[in-house]
Amino acid sequence: MTDLPFTLDQLRIFQAIVVEGSFQKAAQSLYISQPAVSLQIQNLEQQLNAPLFDRSHRKAKLTEAGQVFFKYASRILALCEETCRALEDLHHLQAGSLIIGASQTIGTYLMPGLIGLFRQKYPHICVQLQVHSTRRIAWSVAKGHIDVAVIGGAIPTELIPLLSIQPFAEDELTLIVPPDHPFARLSKIQKEDLYRLRFVSLDRHSTIRKVIDQILHQNGIDTNRLKMEMELNSIEAIKNAVQWGLGAAFVSVCAIAKELELNLVREVEIEAISIKRQLYQITNPNRYQSKAAFTFCQQMLNV
Protein backbone atom coordinates (compact mmCIF):
# COMPACT_ATOMS: atom_id res chain seq x y z
CA MET A 1 0.00 0.00 0.00
CA THR A 2 1.35 3.41 -0.96
CA ASP A 3 2.17 5.71 1.95
CA LEU A 4 -0.22 8.64 2.23
CA PRO A 5 1.29 12.13 1.75
CA PHE A 6 -0.30 13.39 4.96
CA THR A 7 -1.06 12.43 8.55
CA LEU A 8 -4.26 12.86 10.54
CA ASP A 9 -2.51 15.44 12.71
CA GLN A 10 -1.70 17.48 9.61
CA LEU A 11 -5.33 17.25 8.52
CA ARG A 12 -6.50 18.47 11.93
CA ILE A 13 -4.07 21.39 11.83
CA PHE A 14 -5.08 22.27 8.26
CA GLN A 15 -8.80 22.15 9.16
CA ALA A 16 -8.22 24.28 12.27
CA ILE A 17 -6.52 27.01 10.19
CA VAL A 18 -9.46 27.14 7.78
CA VAL A 19 -12.06 27.17 10.57
CA GLU A 20 -10.25 29.69 12.79
CA GLY A 21 -9.13 31.91 9.91
CA SER A 22 -5.44 32.19 10.78
CA PHE A 23 -2.37 30.18 11.72
CA GLN A 24 -2.16 31.95 15.09
CA LYS A 25 -5.75 31.21 16.11
CA ALA A 26 -5.41 27.62 14.93
CA ALA A 27 -2.33 27.20 17.11
CA GLN A 28 -4.20 28.60 20.09
CA SER A 29 -7.19 26.30 19.55
CA LEU A 30 -4.91 23.25 19.29
CA TYR A 31 -2.65 24.32 22.18
CA ILE A 32 0.50 24.14 20.09
CA SER A 33 2.96 26.80 18.96
CA GLN A 34 2.46 28.81 15.78
CA PRO A 35 5.87 27.75 14.38
CA ALA A 36 4.79 24.11 14.83
CA VAL A 37 1.62 24.83 12.86
CA SER A 38 3.57 26.57 10.08
CA LEU A 39 6.09 23.72 9.87
CA GLN A 40 3.38 21.07 9.57
CA ILE A 41 1.66 22.99 6.77
CA GLN A 42 4.96 23.51 4.94
CA ASN A 43 5.68 19.78 5.14
CA LEU A 44 2.15 19.00 3.99
CA GLU A 45 2.41 21.32 0.98
CA GLN A 46 5.75 19.75 0.04
CA GLN A 47 4.31 16.24 0.24
CA LEU A 48 1.28 17.26 -1.82
CA ASN A 49 3.42 19.33 -4.18
CA ALA A 50 0.80 22.08 -4.09
CA PRO A 51 0.35 25.34 -2.15
CA LEU A 52 -2.72 25.20 0.09
CA PHE A 53 -2.81 28.82 1.27
CA ASP A 54 -2.39 32.14 -0.51
CA ARG A 55 0.26 33.89 1.62
CA SER A 56 -0.43 37.31 0.05
CA HIS A 57 -3.45 37.76 2.34
CA ARG A 58 -3.31 38.42 6.08
CA LYS A 59 -6.18 36.02 6.64
CA ALA A 60 -5.59 32.38 5.76
CA LYS A 61 -7.09 32.15 2.27
CA LEU A 62 -7.25 28.82 0.47
CA THR A 63 -5.84 28.32 -2.99
CA GLU A 64 -7.78 26.26 -5.51
CA ALA A 65 -5.80 23.20 -4.41
CA GLY A 66 -6.50 24.12 -0.79
CA GLN A 67 -10.24 24.22 -1.42
CA VAL A 68 -10.19 20.74 -2.95
CA PHE A 69 -8.01 19.40 -0.15
CA PHE A 70 -10.24 20.94 2.54
CA LYS A 71 -13.28 19.17 1.11
CA TYR A 72 -11.66 15.75 1.35
CA ALA A 73 -9.76 16.43 4.57
CA SER A 74 -13.04 17.30 6.29
CA ARG A 75 -14.61 14.06 5.05
CA ILE A 76 -11.63 12.00 6.23
CA LEU A 77 -11.69 13.54 9.70
CA ALA A 78 -15.46 13.14 9.92
CA LEU A 79 -15.15 9.45 9.00
CA CYS A 80 -12.44 8.97 11.63
CA GLU A 81 -14.69 10.55 14.24
CA GLU A 82 -17.64 8.43 13.15
CA THR A 83 -15.51 5.29 13.41
CA CYS A 84 -14.65 6.12 17.01
CA ARG A 85 -18.28 6.93 17.82
CA ALA A 86 -19.48 3.64 16.29
CA LEU A 87 -17.04 1.67 18.42
CA GLU A 88 -18.12 3.57 21.53
CA ASP A 89 -21.67 2.35 20.96
CA LEU A 90 -20.51 -1.20 21.59
CA HIS A 91 -20.24 -0.31 25.25
CA HIS A 92 -24.04 0.08 25.52
CA LEU A 93 -23.83 3.65 26.81
CA GLN A 94 -21.31 2.67 29.47
CA ALA A 95 -18.85 5.07 27.85
CA GLY A 96 -18.82 7.73 25.18
CA SER A 97 -19.58 11.39 24.75
CA LEU A 98 -22.43 13.62 23.70
CA ILE A 99 -22.16 17.20 22.47
CA ILE A 100 -25.37 19.21 22.86
CA GLY A 101 -26.00 22.70 21.55
CA ALA A 102 -28.59 25.27 22.52
CA SER A 103 -29.37 28.92 21.96
CA GLN A 104 -28.88 31.28 24.89
CA THR A 105 -32.11 31.14 26.92
CA ILE A 106 -32.72 27.46 26.22
CA GLY A 107 -29.17 26.49 27.14
CA THR A 108 -29.23 28.50 30.34
CA TYR A 109 -32.62 27.56 31.77
CA LEU A 110 -34.05 24.50 30.00
CA MET A 111 -31.22 22.18 28.97
CA PRO A 112 -29.56 21.69 32.40
CA GLY A 113 -32.70 19.94 33.66
CA LEU A 114 -32.95 17.70 30.58
CA ILE A 115 -29.25 16.86 30.78
CA GLY A 116 -29.67 16.09 34.48
CA LEU A 117 -32.39 13.53 33.72
CA PHE A 118 -30.20 11.94 31.06
CA ARG A 119 -27.19 11.77 33.35
CA GLN A 120 -29.22 10.06 36.06
CA LYS A 121 -29.85 7.18 33.65
CA TYR A 122 -26.48 7.22 31.91
CA PRO A 123 -23.87 8.58 34.34
CA HIS A 124 -20.92 7.30 32.30
CA ILE A 125 -21.71 9.42 29.25
CA CYS A 126 -19.61 12.59 29.11
CA VAL A 127 -21.97 15.42 28.16
CA GLN A 128 -20.81 18.78 26.83
CA LEU A 129 -23.26 21.68 26.45
CA GLN A 130 -22.41 24.49 24.04
CA VAL A 131 -24.50 27.66 24.34
CA HIS A 132 -24.32 30.19 21.50
CA SER A 133 -26.54 32.09 19.09
CA THR A 134 -29.09 30.16 17.03
CA ARG A 135 -27.11 30.76 13.84
CA ARG A 136 -23.82 29.54 15.29
CA ILE A 137 -25.43 26.45 16.83
CA ALA A 138 -27.16 25.56 13.55
CA TRP A 139 -23.89 25.85 11.65
CA SER A 140 -22.11 23.66 14.21
CA VAL A 141 -24.74 20.94 13.77
CA ALA A 142 -24.43 21.18 9.98
CA LYS A 143 -20.63 20.87 10.21
CA GLY A 144 -20.91 17.85 12.50
CA HIS A 145 -19.40 19.56 15.54
CA ILE A 146 -22.58 19.15 17.63
CA ASP A 147 -24.65 15.95 17.91
CA VAL A 148 -28.05 17.47 18.72
CA ALA A 149 -29.29 20.96 19.47
CA VAL A 150 -32.39 22.79 20.63
CA ILE A 151 -32.99 26.27 19.25
CA GLY A 152 -35.79 28.80 19.21
CA GLY A 153 -34.76 31.15 16.44
CA ALA A 154 -34.90 31.16 12.67
CA ILE A 155 -32.55 28.66 11.06
CA PRO A 156 -30.40 30.10 8.24
CA THR A 157 -32.13 29.30 4.94
CA GLU A 158 -29.03 27.75 3.41
CA LEU A 159 -28.83 25.20 6.25
CA ILE A 160 -32.42 23.93 6.16
CA PRO A 161 -31.73 21.25 3.47
CA LEU A 162 -28.77 19.98 5.53
CA LEU A 163 -30.61 19.49 8.84
CA SER A 164 -33.31 17.34 10.36
CA ILE A 165 -35.64 19.83 12.08
CA GLN A 166 -38.29 18.57 14.49
CA PRO A 167 -40.69 20.62 16.65
CA PHE A 168 -39.77 20.03 20.28
CA ALA A 169 -41.84 22.26 22.56
CA GLU A 170 -43.31 25.74 22.90
CA ASP A 171 -41.56 28.39 24.97
CA GLU A 172 -44.02 30.76 26.63
CA LEU A 173 -42.91 34.35 27.08
CA THR A 174 -44.50 36.44 29.81
CA LEU A 175 -44.55 40.02 31.06
CA ILE A 176 -42.89 40.65 34.43
CA VAL A 177 -42.88 43.79 36.60
CA PRO A 178 -41.32 44.70 39.97
CA PRO A 179 -43.35 43.37 42.94
CA ASP A 180 -44.25 46.92 44.06
CA HIS A 181 -45.44 48.04 40.61
CA PRO A 182 -49.15 49.05 40.40
CA PHE A 183 -49.70 46.40 37.72
CA ALA A 184 -48.42 43.70 40.10
CA ARG A 185 -51.72 43.85 41.99
CA LEU A 186 -53.79 43.27 38.85
CA SER A 187 -54.74 39.82 37.59
CA LYS A 188 -54.74 41.08 34.02
CA ILE A 189 -54.01 44.24 32.02
CA GLN A 190 -55.23 45.48 28.65
CA LYS A 191 -52.83 45.60 25.73
CA GLU A 192 -53.11 49.40 25.64
CA ASP A 193 -51.59 49.44 29.14
CA LEU A 194 -48.28 48.37 27.64
CA TYR A 195 -47.76 51.94 26.41
CA ARG A 196 -47.67 53.09 30.07
CA LEU A 197 -44.75 50.83 30.97
CA ARG A 198 -41.02 51.42 30.78
CA PHE A 199 -39.26 48.37 29.34
CA VAL A 200 -35.86 46.74 29.67
CA SER A 201 -35.16 44.35 26.83
CA LEU A 202 -32.65 42.31 24.92
CA ASP A 203 -31.03 43.84 21.85
CA ARG A 204 -33.49 44.39 18.99
CA HIS A 205 -31.53 41.87 16.88
CA SER A 206 -31.95 39.03 19.39
CA THR A 207 -34.23 36.11 18.56
CA ILE A 208 -36.56 36.56 21.54
CA ARG A 209 -36.90 40.30 20.92
CA LYS A 210 -37.89 39.64 17.30
CA VAL A 211 -40.51 37.08 18.37
CA ILE A 212 -42.00 39.45 20.95
CA ASP A 213 -42.10 42.40 18.54
CA GLN A 214 -43.71 40.26 15.84
CA ILE A 215 -46.48 38.91 18.11
CA LEU A 216 -47.20 42.31 19.63
CA HIS A 217 -47.42 43.79 16.14
CA GLN A 218 -49.82 41.02 15.10
CA ASN A 219 -52.02 41.98 18.07
CA GLY A 220 -52.18 45.62 17.10
CA ILE A 221 -49.41 46.92 19.36
CA ASP A 222 -47.17 49.58 17.84
CA THR A 223 -43.77 48.50 19.21
CA ASN A 224 -42.28 51.84 18.19
CA ARG A 225 -44.49 53.49 20.82
CA LEU A 226 -43.27 51.22 23.62
CA LYS A 227 -40.86 52.97 25.97
CA MET A 228 -37.61 51.00 25.70
CA GLU A 229 -35.57 52.47 28.52
CA MET A 230 -32.66 50.05 28.39
CA GLU A 231 -31.23 47.26 26.21
CA LEU A 232 -29.23 44.53 27.95
CA ASN A 233 -27.34 41.51 26.65
CA SER A 234 -28.55 38.76 28.99
CA ILE A 235 -31.74 37.46 30.60
CA GLU A 236 -30.09 37.54 34.03
CA ALA A 237 -29.33 41.24 33.62
CA ILE A 238 -32.92 41.88 32.57
CA LYS A 239 -34.34 40.03 35.58
CA ASN A 240 -32.09 41.98 37.94
CA ALA A 241 -33.10 45.25 36.28
CA VAL A 242 -36.78 44.43 36.82
CA GLN A 243 -36.15 43.48 40.45
CA TRP A 244 -34.52 46.87 41.02
CA GLY A 245 -37.48 48.69 39.53
CA LEU A 246 -35.82 49.79 36.30
CA GLY A 247 -38.72 48.64 34.15
CA ALA A 248 -40.89 45.78 32.93
CA ALA A 249 -39.75 43.01 30.61
CA PHE A 250 -40.84 40.06 28.51
CA VAL A 251 -38.95 36.89 29.46
CA SER A 252 -39.29 33.15 29.03
CA VAL A 253 -41.39 31.49 31.75
CA CYS A 254 -38.66 28.89 32.26
CA ALA A 255 -36.24 31.67 33.25
CA ILE A 256 -38.20 33.11 36.19
CA ALA A 257 -39.33 30.16 38.34
CA LYS A 258 -37.03 31.11 41.22
CA GLU A 259 -37.83 34.82 41.01
CA LEU A 260 -41.58 34.15 41.12
CA GLU A 261 -41.21 31.78 44.06
CA LEU A 262 -39.22 34.37 46.03
CA ASN A 263 -41.59 37.19 45.01
CA LEU A 264 -38.75 39.11 43.38
CA VAL A 265 -40.86 39.83 40.30
CA ARG A 266 -44.55 39.51 39.42
CA GLU A 267 -46.03 37.95 36.31
CA VAL A 268 -48.74 40.00 34.59
CA GLU A 269 -51.20 38.55 32.08
CA ILE A 270 -52.18 40.61 29.04
CA GLU A 271 -55.79 40.37 27.89
CA ALA A 272 -56.15 38.30 24.70
CA ILE A 273 -52.40 38.11 24.02
CA SER A 274 -50.34 34.93 24.28
CA ILE A 275 -46.66 35.11 23.36
CA LYS A 276 -45.11 31.78 22.46
CA ARG A 277 -42.28 30.61 20.24
CA GLN A 278 -41.67 27.18 18.79
CA LEU A 279 -38.54 25.34 19.89
CA TYR A 280 -36.89 22.86 17.53
CA GLN A 281 -34.65 19.86 17.93
CA ILE A 282 -32.08 19.75 15.13
CA THR A 283 -29.65 17.05 14.05
CA ASN A 284 -27.54 16.30 10.99
CA PRO A 285 -29.19 13.44 9.04
CA ASN A 286 -26.06 12.94 6.93
CA ARG A 287 -23.88 12.21 9.94
CA TYR A 288 -23.65 9.04 11.97
CA GLN A 289 -25.80 9.43 15.08
CA SER A 290 -24.36 7.79 18.17
CA LYS A 291 -26.52 5.73 20.47
CA ALA A 292 -26.08 8.39 23.16
CA ALA A 293 -27.33 11.11 20.79
CA PHE A 294 -30.27 8.99 19.65
CA THR A 295 -31.24 8.16 23.24
CA PHE A 296 -31.04 11.80 24.31
CA CYS A 297 -33.20 12.89 21.36
CA GLN A 298 -35.84 10.32 22.26
CA GLN A 299 -35.77 11.38 25.91
CA MET A 300 -36.36 15.02 24.98
CA LEU A 301 -39.33 14.20 22.81
CA ASN A 302 -40.89 12.03 25.53
CA VAL A 303 -40.49 14.42 28.47
From Swiss-Prot:
Pfam families for the chain: HTH_1 (PF00126), LysR_substrate (PF03466)
GO cellular component assignments: chloroplast
DNA-binding region in chain numbering: 23-42
Entry-linked Gene3D superfamilies: 3.40.190.290, Winged helix-like DNA-binding domain superfamily/Winged helix DNA-binding domain
Subcellular location, record wording: Plastid, Chloroplast
Keywords assigned: Chloroplast, DNA-binding, Plastid, Transcription, Transcription regulation
GO molecular function: DNA-binding transcription factor activity; transcription cis-regulatory region binding
Domain HTH lysR-type: 6-63
Coiled coil: none
Predominant location: plastid
Function: Trans-acting transcriptional regulator of RuBisCO genes (rbcL and rbcS) expression.
Protein family per UniProt: Belongs to the LysR transcriptional regulatory family.
Protein name as it appears in the record: Probable RuBisCO transcriptional regulator
The species this protein was found in: Cyanidioschyzon merolae (strain NIES-3377 / 10D)
Lineage: Eukaryota, Rhodophyta, Bangiophyceae, Cyanidiales, Cyanidiaceae
